[in-house]
Swiss-Prot record:
This enzyme's EC code(s): 5.6.2.2
Record text on subunit structure and interactions: Heterotetramer, composed of two GyrA and two GyrB chains. In the heterotetramer, GyrA contains the active site tyrosine that forms a transient covalent intermediate with DNA, while GyrB binds cofactors and catalyzes ATP hydrolysis.
The protein's name: DNA gyrase subunit A
Residues annotated as the enzyme's active site: Y123
Catalytic activity: ATP-dependent breakage, passage and rejoining of double-stranded DNA
One Pfam family per UniProt: DNA_gyraseA_C
Cellular component terms per the entry's GO annotation: chromosome; cytoplasm; DNA topoisomerase type II (double strand cut, ATP-hydrolyzing) complex
Family matches, as PROSITE patterns: TOPO_IIA (PS52040)
Main location: cytoplasm
Keyword terms, alphabetized: ATP-binding, Cytoplasm, DNA-binding, Isomerase, Nucleotide-binding, Topoisomerase
Motif residue range(s): GyrA-box: 551-557
Compartments it resides in: Cytoplasm
Organism whose genome encodes this protein: Rickettsia typhi (strain ATCC VR-144 / Wilmington)
């Protein structure tokens, strides 16, 4: 190769070039072809067709024009991608079986439900439909931005100022690179009602929107079976909706019946459906049909299926549902472009995006109209000044040699305005008066004066001028009010939506059938105790509790799970397959899930990422999981207590979290440098114990905190922390009625004796040597709780909860454990029972279970004993308790009776 050409060559890595080029191609397909914009619900080709028809005057009130002319205009001005793609898009916009509200009014053959192709574009004619005008209304008032077209000769709108949520009303479908969208059509009236509800309350729950948006409304009618698919689609943006055609059974004499299909599912080819039924009859997969014919006409669908004598029609119909597309699924993927990027959105997010867009449109329109009104008022003020000084105006004009000199002389002169000063103030004109209360004409005003007709000098015209100025003043005041008041702007938005509804809303075509289609599958789930493990990397799994064997204290443990990429266990708890769980995330959101929906694994398995199970946002991860009682009747008297690392706490009603949609809800507001440590159910007569990693603890009554209804509150100060210290655990304890003196006296009784008293063993009051009576000792023994404290270096101890005195929240607390370099920092604090077992997990994935009865009971201010032999650089990261309910022994089978969990984040 000569130097002439080699000097222009730039060597590149072919792998990098292919990646970059393919990414460019993918984004081009996503943004410029296949995915609709959430604001107007249109892809670029549809937007260009409608705008081109609008610009060409091909309106609903005008005569039809040849489709070929429309396609040519679109291709020549905006869309240089071939006429067939443009015409196919135009054809679909005319089909009343494809769009709920067709955007193009067609005349001629535009295809059919049988899959027939439309006639050539030279034969068909089109014009905008009436509802399409609502997509372009106010487009000439500065409402949306315009872009240069492909050759720089024209401008086209980046989006249409749609007055109704077209994305939901007409739906959309498309396949891009690596993604697809499939949004069903809806009823206009229902969608606008949902928009109005959102305008009235931006915090409305999606389930409340479902009260008005019953589900998709397909242009072909048919039925939707069940609401589970609808709920999933609206809550998460993805779902599968079961569609079923409508059929009637008629008696035709001689003990014979016929099935009449009158509606078919959306996007099902009717001719292929009939062929499929015939094929199934031929293969004898459907039996009992003697005749089949398509009797459909312009009045609607009618597929006649004649049955043999004495055949049960319901059985045949069910066979047709099972074997053909008379019953099929619509896979919903509510993917659309938001801020130029593809995003899967739920129902509320789509509505919110549309409402936000309409706010911008109305604001831009108001600014445009305000400027126009002010410009007009400015000219009228000039005319008013001229009429007030008409003699001098005429003299100047007559004395000038030409128009330019007259205009300049008018602009140079200072004019009295005292007579019209009220009009100037009325229209809020920004003129600059000099010290003597005079002003000069602007060039615009001077030009208008020179063009003024003599008839404007009459008294009637003067009065009309004043009335025009007053009218403009009213308009200007209204425009300023709209710009200053979001409330007024939303009122206008809502009024315009309601007008569209009144003009174009039609009855629902698609019925929704409830019943066995939404049958709960939980009855089929076998009850089994599971160990749920969550890793810091966001992986979760459930393992049958029987997979773990019991070991004695001091053992080396077994491999609990395979740790990859230095992932460590964050949380472990035990529950039934039917246990409901609340998942709390680092950004303060809460999600709800039943335990059986978690991935089943083995002790060495890693599980699945929670982002594949819950609809987590970018940079969002689960920090806490709270198992709840299976019986929701028990929730009525429970509260939820939140605790954060910075020592904040909040008490809320558990019932506030009873109805949580699939995409979650806000649970608590967190500061940027704070994180959620624990969330637990509690009762009013119970106590809260906060513990820190530095070995401090603080106990206070639940009733000392008021219930906070706001889910966006960050709560109140629970504990004052030292520098570098943080809360690592929150424990719920029983309330106590005894005095501190009585508790101190009780604690002088040896713990072995206290345990025996609690088990019912008789005791000698005098031998105990305390001033308490027998009833008090017995009551305190039966109510005594023990607090387990575990450190990162494997040390642990049990202490009586009576040793933690009750104080006011907000204090610094008392010593919980004597920590040092040998013990390390505290990682877990929780109440335990005598027959509990301890489960510890280290950052290397090692797991051990040991009997708590072998863990020494000591006072608060002690360091405890070694619970777990650790290797170098090994730390305890998770502590859980499992209560034994079956026979004891080293390899006993264990089930859950109570559970607490703590983690080191």
């Amino acid at each position: 190769m000569t130097d002439k050409y080699s000097s222009n060559l730039v060597p590149v890595n072919i792998e990098d070039e292919m990646k970059a080029s393919y990414l460019d191609y993918a984004m081009s397909v996503i943004v410029s072809r296949a995915i609709p914009d959430v604001r107007d619900g249109l892809k670029p080709v549809h937007r260009r067709i409608i705008y081109s028809m609008y610009e060409a005057g091909n309106h609903a009130s005008k005569p039809y024009r040849k489709s070929a002319r429309i396609v040519g205009d679109v291709m020549g001005k905006y869309h240089p991608h071939g006429d067939s793609a443009i015409y196919d898009s135009l054809v679909r916009m005319t089909q009343d079986f494809s769009l709920r509200l067709p955007l193009v009014d067609g005349q001629g053959n535009f295809g059919s439900m049988d899959g027939d192709a439309a006639a050539a574009m030279r034969y068909t004619e089109s014009r905008m439909s009436k509802v399409a005008h609502k997509l372009v209304e106010d487009i000439d008032k500065g409402t949306v931005s315009f872009n240069i077209n492909y050759d720089g000769s024209e401008e086209e709108p980046s989006v249409l100022p749609a007055m109704f949520p077209n994305l939901l009303v007409n739906g959309s479908g498309g396949i891009a690179v690596g993604m697809a969208t499939n949004i069903p059509p809806h009823n206009l009236g229902e969608i606008i009602d949902a928009c109005c509800l959102y305008i009235d309350n931006n915090d409305i729950e999606i389930l409340d929107l479902l009260e008005v948006v019953k589900g998709p409304d397909f242009p072909t009618g048919s039925m939707i079976l069940g609401i589970s698919g609808i709920r999933s689609a609206y809550l998460t943006g993805r779902g599968s909706i079961i569609m079923r055609g409508k059929a009637e059974i008629e008696n035709i004499g001689n003990s014979r019946q016929a099935i009449i299909i009158t509606e078919i599912p959306y996007m099902v080819n009717k001719a292929r459906l009939v062929e499929k039924i015939a094929e199934m009859v031929k293969e004898k997969r459907i039996e009992g049909i003697s005749d089949l014919r398509d009797e459909s006409n312009k009045n609607g669908v009618r597929i006649f299926i004649e049955l043999k004598k004495d055949v049960v029609a319901e059985v045949v119909l069910n066979q047709i549902y099972a074997c053909t597309q008379l019953q099929t699924n619509f896979g919903v993927i509510m993917l659309a472009l938001k801020d130029g990027l593809p995003k899967v959105m739920n129902l509320k997010e789509v509505i919110a995006a549309f409402v936000s867009f309409r706010e911008v449109v109305i604001t831009n329109r108001t600014i445009y109209l305000l400027n126009k009104a002010r410009d007009r008022a400015h000219i009228l003020l000039g005319l008013a000044i001229a009429i007030s000084n008409i003699d001098e105006i005429i003299y100047i004009i007559k004395a000038s040699n030409d128009t330019n000199l007259a205009k300049q002389e008018l602009m140079d002169r200072q004019w009295e305005v005292l007579d019209i000063l009220p009009l100037i103030k009325l229209v809020d004109d920004k003129v600059m008066l000099n010290e003597r209360g005079k002003l000069s004409f602007t060039e615009v005003q001077a030009k208008a004066i020179l063009e003024m007709k003599l008839q404007r000098l009459t008294a009637m015209e003067k009065n009309k001028l004043e009335q025009d100025l007053k009218h403009l003043a009213t308009e200007i005041a209204e425009y300023l009010n709209i710009l200053d008041s979001r409330t007024r702007l939303l009122e206008i938005l809502k009024e315009e939506l309601i007008k569209v509804k009144e003009e174009f809303a039609v009855p629902r075509l698609t019925a929704i059938e409830f019943g066995e289609f939404d049958q709960d599958i939980e009855d089929l789930i076998q009850r089994e105790e599971m160990v749920v493990t969550v890793t810091l990397g966001g992986y979760i799994k459930r393992v049958p509790l029987s997979s773990y064997r019991s070991q004695k204290r001091g053992g080396k443990g077994r491999s609990g799970l395979s740790m990859r990429d230095e992932d460590i266990t964050m949380q472990v708890f035990v529950g039934s397959t039917h246990t409901p769980m609340l998942f709390f995330s680092n950004i303060g959101k809460v999600y709800s899930l039943k335990l059986y929906k978690l991935p089943l694994s083995n002790p060495q398995g890693k599980g699945r990422p929670m982002v594949n199970i819950l609809p987590l946002q970018e940079n969002e991860h689960i920090t806490n999981i709270m198992p709840l009682p299976e019986n929701q009747d028990e929730w009525d008297h429970l509260n939820i207590m939140f605790a954060t690392a910075k020592g904040n706490i909040r008490r809320s009603d558990l019932l506030d979290f009873k109805k949580i949609q699939l995409n979650g809800k806000i649970a608590i507001r967190l500061d940027e440098d704070d994180k959620l440590i624990d969330v637990k159910p509690c009762k009013e007569d119970e106590h809260i114990l906060l513990a820190t990693k530095a070995g401090k603890a603080l106990r206070f009554p639940v009733e000392s905190l008021r219930i906070i209804k706001s889910r966006i509150s960050d709560g109140v100060r629970g504990m004052k922390l030292a520098k570098e210290d943080s809360v690592i655990s929150m424990t719920v304890l029983k309330g106590i009625n005894s005095t501190k003196e009585d508790r101190d006296a009780y604690l002088t009784v040896p713990w072995e004796k206290r345990l025996k008293i609690a088990k019912g063993e008789e005791f000698n009051l005098e031998a105990l040597g305390v001033h308490l009576n027998a009833d008090s000792i017995l009551e305190m023994a039966n109510s005594e709780e023990f607090i387990l404290t575990v450190t990162e270096n494997g040390f642990g101890k049990r202490s009586s909860a009576y040793g933690y005195r009750i104080t006011d929240r907000g204090g610094s607390g008392i010593i919980n454990m004597d920590i040092n370099d040998k013990t390390g920092l505290v990682v877990g604090v929780m109440p335990v029972k005598m027959d509990d077992e301890l489960m510890l997990i280290t950052n290397s994935g090692k797991l051990i279970r040991c009997k708590l009865e072998s863990v020494r009971i000591t006072g608060r201010n002690t360091s405890g004993v070694i619970l777990f032999k650790l290797d170098d650089d090994e730390k305890v990261v998770s502590v859980s308790l499992i209560a034994e309910t079956s026979e004891s022994g080293e390899d006993s089978e264990l089930v859950e009776d109570g559970l607490e969990s703590a983690e080191n984040m």
